[in-house]
Structures are given as structure tokens and as C-alpha cells.
Amino acid sequence: MQRVREYVADSPFEYQKNCLLYLPKDLKRCRRGSQEETEMIADHIHSLICSTYGHTLVLFTSYHLMGNVYQMLRDEIPFPMIGVWRHSPEEITRFKQTDNAVLFAAGSCWEGVDFPGDMVSSLIIVKLPFAVPDPISEAEKETYDSLESYIQSIIVP
């Protein structure tokens, strides 16, 4: 058996100084997919985008919800809004070339997209993406005392 070596490099990014995690405390419980839920999400997104003067990437797990929120905000946001409905390098390039832009995205924009510098100063994640369970992860989940302990240990490290 070969020896495995590991090297963990320090990040040049100072997370403590440069990041803020915002979790709204005033979220109401709404029926999933309801108009009330969509309006509540749109209101929070509107406030956050305006407080950062654009420069925002808004990630959704649902194209349907993304489209509804986009439609609600398109005339309300004072910054250029760009929506990526499927993998669209053209729209991502347009976002990179547009000052103070806001990019609404789902699917392919969750991984492998680079926005260097201050192009994105605010990242809004509407809902965390959870992968479709597979037999191995299901068996692993059963080794935990509760679903909450599994989520805290594996899903949200």
C-alpha cells in the first residue's frame, strides 16, 4: 500500500475580515412553492442586492422559482439583471462585462464558474442543493443516531 501525502495550503482570502453570513430571522413558514414563499424570497433578495449595489450572484436550486423571482424583480432592481436558464457561457460573459450586474442562475452555475476580483461581492444562496440520495449515502445515513446529526456531520460540515 502506498503512503498518501496531504498538503493543506492556507487561503490568501481572509474570510473573517471579508465575509458576512446573513441568515434572515424573520422568515415565515410558507407552503413550499406558494406565491407567499416566492414573494418573501423576492423581498429578501431585493434588499440584499440593493445594499450591495449589484455585484450579486443569486443561486437557485429550481429554475421555476428562479424564473418567478426574476419576473417579480426585473422592474424593481436598479441594476442590470441577467438570467442563466441553462448552461449559457454567453450570459456569464455578459455578466462579467457588465458593471454592477446581478446574475440569477441555477444548475450549471453552482460549480466551475469563476468570477475573479470584485465581480461578485454578494452571493445569495436561496436554498442549499442536496443531491439525490444513492444507496451508499442512504446506508451511511443509517449509521447516525438522528437525521439532524447526519446533516450536521456530512451535509453541512
Predicted segments with their positions:
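Conserved interdomain hinge at the start of the Helicase C-terminal
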Residues: 22-61
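Structured helix-beta-strand junction loops
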Residues: 51-52, 76, 98-99
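Well-ordered alpha-helical segments embedded in enzymatic catalytic cores
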Residues: 40-47, 68, 90-94, 108
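Short coil/turn segments at secondary-structure boundaries
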Residues: 6-9, 61
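Conserved helicase motor "Helicase C" RecA-like lobe of SF1/SF2 P-loop NTPases
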Residues: 56-86
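Conserved RecA-like P-loop NTPase helicase motor core
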Residues: 12-20, 24-36, 80-82, 86-157
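Segments forming glycine/polar-rich beta-alpha architectures that bind adenosine-containing cofactors
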Residues: 1-5
